[in-house]
Structure formats: structure tokens, C-alpha cells
Amino acid sequence: MEEDSLYLGGEWQFNHFSKLTSSRPDAAFAEIQRTSLPEKSPLSCETRVDLCDDLAPVARQLAPREKLPLSNRRPAAVGAGLQNMGNTCYVNASLQCLTYTPPLANYMLSREHSQTCHRHKGCMLCTMQAHITRALHNPGHVIQPSQALAAGFHRGKQEDAHEFLMFTVDAMKKACLPGHKQVDHHSKDTTLIHQIFGGYWRSQIKCLHCHGISDTFDPYLDIALDIQAAQSVQQALEQLVKPEELNGENAYHCGVCLQRAPASKMLTLLTSAKVLILVLKRFSDVTGNKIAKNVQYPECLDMQPYMSQPNTGPLVYVLYAVLVHAGWSCHNGHYFSYVKAQEGQWYKMDDAEVTASSITSVLSQQAYVLFYIQKSEWERHSESVSRGREPRALGAEDTDRRATQGELKRDHPCLQAPELDEHLVERATQESTLDHWKFLQEQNKTKPEFNVRKVEGTLPPDVLVIHQSKYKCGMKNHHPEQQSSLLNLSSSTPTHQESMNTGTLASLRGRARRSKGKNKHSKRALLVCQ
């Protein structure tokens, strides 16, 4: 992994005698010695943020929070399925969760980045913009993810989905900094990606001898939860912020009274992200074996009890995506995900197969990674749908939007590049050949321990399969009457209205004929269950 990705990054430290373990050992920090303070007079959350801003002089040049384009641009319906190119289910499951992250999707659909970035090749933001745009605007199709999305990560075998997820998030974060390569770590933590996924921990140690307080602030992009002794996400969070007593051999060397004395240590959230990525630690760091236990997680999660300022009212998050692993090790088995489309319907995204699901099914999974968004943000997106506002076309003229983009361009790191022509933007969506991936897959392919396509062999009686994967062995065994009702959606297929008028479904025989038209996508079969 990249050294400044994943869990804790660079730190802001107050009284440097207390220091959290950081994945960036070279991170710079500020030191402020604080003498004994009254118990009820800690720095306020706002004061801490102001101090942090002072440590990041170019922060407002990277991605101003007040100018983050979060207006709704997403289509209401579910988008495309993703083709499995050989042991890439972990890639597909992670990409679907990111695709249905509202703030990220809205920013990508605005094409703000591609209009100002001059390094399309090797830029993860440009690559993700092309992928999200294609996925959301091609419902009923199966698309192939670009090789560039997993370049430098995929080695022809299955990898850990959470590691790939954070690899991608970290690469997007770095893509925000091409014009500010010399900025300090604090400024890097103000990028657009950090504004969406990032927040700050506060680790506070209080000396019980002189009552001196030492605070350390660390940025995060995701939160790892120990589930060994937890039955729910709330219990895991409570354990994470539970005060720890430091005494005896673990006594604290106070930087205020300069004595070795008993102390209390508490880890809390100074600021919480717009989008929370909660990873349940299901795999052993040594053996990779899985902790296969049910851990309850809610549809709505109040994060206020885990904040540094716990008495300021509810801070409610709503679930919008779940990444699931089926199997016994992080290096085998199968990954898939559940996502919540803008209209509020849940869907199971299993490679090429997109199936309507229910919240009951979503909440009954052995989840690996949970995605929550602040309720106020989700309701704002849902409100635009309920009012019947259709998403604007990508090239639509909008005075307010253009004004906002103009303000952002003056502060964005990729500002000096000329605006791209349409064919240059389209070029970013083109994919190179997959021969290299297939070659690596054949050379390194290991025989699976079980048939990963039979993870869920049965379908609920009221399920609606929007499009069907090529892996139909499980359905043939459990739903032969449904398998026989597949609609042939080749290039000669009648229109949707004609099919509904006739009321008949043709049997799918053989593979669908490839379309010869430019930029055509293969159609998917439609399965209707009574």
C-alpha cells in the first residue's frame, strides 16, 4: 500500500509527548505545550479546526469545502453491471460502492476535473470519472472496467476488496495534488477526496497528577472496527472510544509536570466525514482467515456518542452501500455488493448481474465494509427525485452551475490546463485490450476451493432480476422455471413497449450476437419472476 493511504495519516499534535501510531513516520507536526487546564475547559471543536487551518496555509487552494459541487446529477435508475475479467470480483464490488457514493458521483458527472486536468493518462480521478459516467448512464448493460483502474494492483489473482478500495481512494486523493506536490501533509488532507471521506481523530491523554492534557489529531479516510467481542457496529464503536487507564508499567510520562504518572487516554472523533467507510476487521493479519460471525449494523447510525463533543444533538448517517465477502479467506471466495440507487431501491451488484433487493436482505449479510452518508446529504438528493426533477444532460448549460465551477477552477490544483474538447474527454473512456489481464490470470490462476457462483443458490419468490450474469448454474438448479423465461435482447430485439404489448418472452439460445455499431454495449437478459 502507499505509505499515506488507508487508516491514519499525518498528525497534528498538541504536546508532543503523546503520539498516535501513524503510517506516515515523517509527518510534520505542531507542538503546543499546555499547562494544567480546568477539566471543563478543553479547546472547542471549532478552535481545533481553526488551529488546523493555520497549519495548512495552502489548504483553501486545493478544494474549498464551501465550493464542493454536490448538486444532484445522478440518474434515478440503477446503472450497469460489471464484467468479471477473471478473479476481479473484488474490483467490481468496490467500484460499485464508489459509483453509488452521491458526493463522488455528482462531482464526477459534473466533469469538473477532466475540464481542468491535463494528465488524463495515469490520473485516477479522470479514470474514475470515465468509469462512473459510463456505469450510471448505461442501465441495462454490462460494461468492462478499464484496466487502468487496477493498474499496479491486480496480479491475476483475487485480492482483498478493502485494500483495493482504499488504494483507489488514495490514488484519487493524490490526483488532486498535481499542482501542489510540495505541500505539507496537512494541506494534502484538505483535498476534495478528504472532504468526502475524511475526518479527524482526537487522541487525548489527561495526566491524573497535574491534570495536564495532551491532544493528538490524526486524519482518517476509513474507520476499522474490531469485531472479535462485538455483536453490532455500535458495540464495536463503543469499544473503540472506551477510555483506557495508563498506570503501572504503562504509566504516562507527562510533558507538563515531567513526571511518570497515571493517566487516562481516550480516542474520539474530532470531525466526522460526509461519507463514512466502516471496515469490519474480519480477516486475521497473520493467516488471512476470516471471522465468520454475524455483526448487526443499522440502516441509520447516530455517530454523535463517539464524537469529541457528544452533547450537540444527533449526527445521523444512513446506509447506502454494503460490500460483502463470501468465503473463508480474503484471498479466495467471492465479493459482491449491495447499493442503494437514487430512487431508494436497493440492488445486489454481483459482477454482471444486477438484482433488485430489499433492506431486509441487505441488513442480514455478513458485511465486510459498510458505507454511510450523512442523512441530510442523502435527503437532499432524494428530495430532488421526489420533486420530479430530471438529471440534466452532461452538456447542459446552467448559469448557476457554471458560476460555481468557475469559482472552483480559480482554486483547483489543475487550473492552468485548457478546457478539453469533447473527443478528448471521450478518449478517457476508451479501454485498451484485456489480453494482458487474461494472460496474467491464466498464469497465476489458482483452483478455487469451492464454487463461488453458488454463494446464494436460491432467489426470493418476489425477486426481480434486472439483468442476468453468464453464470447461471445456480439458477438452473433452483429456479428452472425462471431460467426458461429469458428475454433475447440482441440487436434485433423489439422495443421495450413492443415486448410488453406481446406479453411473451423468447428463450435465450446461444450467445447474443455482438453489435457492430460503434460504442454499442451488449444487452442483458431480463428475468421476470412471478
Curated annotation (Swiss-Prot):
Domain USP stretches: 80-375
Cell location: Nucleus; Endoplasmic reticulum
Membrane-spanning intervals of the chain: none
Pfam family, one: UCH
Keyword Cell wall biogenesis/degradation: no
Catalytic residues in the record: 89 (nucleophile), 334 (proton acceptor)
Basic and acidic residues bias locations: 382-392, 398-412
EC number: 3.4.19.12
Compositionally biased intervals (Polar residues): 493-505
Chief place where the protein resides: nucleus
Name of the molecule in the record: Ubiquitin carboxyl-terminal hydrolase 17-like protein 21
Organism: Homo sapiens
